[in-house]
Amino acid sequence: MNMGLFYGSSTCYTEMAAEKIRDIIGPELVTLHNLKDDSPKLMEQYDVLILGIPTWDFGEIQEDWEAVWDQLDDLNLEGKIVALYGLGDQLGYGEWFLDALGMLHDKLSTKGVKFVGYWPTEGYEFTSPKPVIADGQLFVGLALDETNQYDLSDERIQSWCEQILNEMAEHYA
């Protein structure tokens, strides 16, 4: 099973999370791709995709993702396992918290992918409906807030990595 971790990062927090995820799962299994430098077309060569996207300003897509956004429509991702993680500021921008994560989930949901890694909303304060499912009980991916809950990020990343590995094992069982 080969995994590609694709991310966009303007302030390095999404990139640092990518590196932590790679180190937990294993550098021999996960290849990092910064969308600033690498084409999203490379996603097609992996069985599993981990995609990291921060939300900017008032619910905007980060610039590296925005630059390749339309290219995602042309990718053949049928049958791939996809785990998403997002970064945002829940207190300063609660009504747009992780909107980009929700938009990425929506964009990929028509591509025949199998999502893993939905994450509980408990412990977060926000009002945006975009990044959640299951009556608001789950985010569509790991939710990180390096502004207000940075002290929880390492534990959340560790737990989420264990969760997605278990969910992938069930898929391949």
Curated annotation (Swiss-Prot):
Pfam families with a match to the protein in the record: Flavodoxin_1
Xref: Gene3D superfamilies: 3.40.50.360
GO MF annotation: an example: FMN binding
Flavodoxin-like domain: residues covered: 3-165
Keyword Flavoprotein recorded: yes
Cofactors (names): FMN
Top-level taxon of the source organism: Bacteria
UniProt keyword terms in alphabetical order: Electron transport, Flavoprotein, FMN, Transport
Family statement drawn from the similarity comment of this UniProt entry: Belongs to the flavodoxin family.
Role played: Low-potential electron donor to a number of redox enzymes.
Name of the protein in its database record: Flavodoxin 2
Organism phylogeny: Bacteria, Pseudomonadati, Pseudomonadota, Gammaproteobacteria, Enterobacterales
Underlying gene: fldB
